[in-house]
Amino acid sequence: MSVIDSSEETRIPVSREGLLKVTEIFYSLQGEARDAGRPTVFIRLTGCPLRCVYCDSEYAFYGGEWQNIDQIMEQVASYQTPYVCVTGGEPLAQKRCQDLLNRLCETGYRVSLETSGAMDVSQVDERISRVLDIKTPGSGETGRNLWSNLDVLSEHDQVKFVLCSRADYDWAMAEIRKRGLEQKLDILLSPAWGQVEPADLAQWVLNDHLNVRVQLQLHKLLWGDVPGK
């Protein structure tokens, strides 16, 4: 297991006027959520206030390069695809993230935002598909869930539960039913890589007649746990 740097600097990068701290911008197939399989440009912003046990992008906690929005947009345009995913880390931890999201929408891109669920999403442009990661007990960060976010989501958005165990699944199922999420928007259940067998999760969902999607991380099936894919 890697050692996670929990210093404040890696949690939320110090702001610089007009700039965003970027870990990487890359082109790959979307591996998760509604657009899985689509060629997509990923903008991975640096820093995250959470430390989930199953995190597969710890390298985004530190480092990165300060860039202005014009520089980011130029790189995105070079890949010639209409699909863009802004991810992290926790992208909303950076103040200028909203400016980037707005610029992407105004330029005509189809944009998704992958967020931890611990930051307020109410001000995110409604043209963006918000993919909210609700933290299960196995993540070690359940107490950071900002449940009020669910009140502002629409059928255009998605919620995701990453499951580390059967206990996580039972917890997620209880929350889904208690909050009426099945009738509101797409729900994604994803087995934590190497911790829950995908076939087991599939059978649990079938047994319980849940109106959800079982989500496997396509990029990991294709390339393994490799950054930039």
Labelled PLM ranges:
Residues 15, 20-24, 39-42, 46, ...:
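Conserved Radical SAM active-site core
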